[in-house]
Regions:
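Short, charged helix-capping/linker segments at alpha-helix termini
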Residues: 2-7, 21-30, 40-59, 72-75, ...
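C-terminal edge and immediately downstream basic/flexible tail or linker adjoining helix-turn-helix-like DNA-binding
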Residues: 2-8, 19, 48, 105, ...
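Internal acidic/polar
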Residues: 6-13, 91, 96-126, 146
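Residues within the DNA-recognition helix of helix-turn-helix
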Residues: 35, 164-171
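Short helix-coil-helix linker/hinge
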Residues: 126-134
Length: 185
């Protein structure tokens, strides 16, 4: 006879979140199974580094498990999860920048360009954006967050978020146009 957890794949997420809040590890495992690819993809957009993105996604889910009992509304789980993901990313940036400062490396280092003639995909174009612009652009266009939600999640002023999105989108378009036209720099 099948156990209750055999039905978890068919359960609504809100129900699973309620169970996970009560300490049900199997319900949480089902939540992770459902959400892990979207969190990994979000992290990959932020950092353009698969192994790092996977490590950061794992940190996100660990933080979720440790804090899920504090979630007030199970219906708000998706937004809460994204806020944790952004928090983990920002923590990583602060830690990385502190290490760079200690080692004397420049904070302006950018991803290196591929050789001329190799098409630049969206992830590589995103990697050329300054971190704050990339964060805001990804949250807006990939995650569908409103400008206000991004401001609340990142603790940036609303006007700054709007500027980062506008300028970042313009830079992305310019970067993609250069490679689409076969031009090199």
């Amino acid at each position: 006879m099948p156990g209750a957890r055999d039905y978890y794949p068919e359960c609504p997420e809100a129900f699973l979140v309620s169970l996970a809040r009560g300490g049900d590890r199997h319900a949480f495992a089902e939540i992770v199974r459902r959400r892990q690819s979207s969190i990994r993809n979000l992290m990959r957009r932020f950092c353009n580094d698969r192994p790092l993105a996977d490590d950061l996604a794992q940190q996100v889910f660990l933080k979720v498990w440790l804090n899920i009992r504090g979630l007030k509304k199970v219906e708000a789980f998706g937004g809460w999860l994204r806020r944790i993901a952004v928090s983990v990313w920002l923590h990583h940036l602060r830690h990385r920048d502190a290490l760079r400062g200690a080692s004397g490396l420049s904070g302006d280092e950018r991803a290196t360009r591929e050789t001329a003639g190799v098409a630049l995909d969206l992830d590589r174009a995103l990697a050329t954006l300054p971190e704050a612009e990339r964060l805001c652009v990804v949250l807006s266009y990939n995650e569908g967050m409103s400008h206000r939600e991004i401001a609340e999640t990142t603790d940036l002023p609303l006007g700054t978020v709007k500027s980062h999105i506008r300028i970042g989108a313009r830079r992305l378009q310019s970067e993609l146009d250069v490679y689409a036209g076969g031009n090199t720099r």
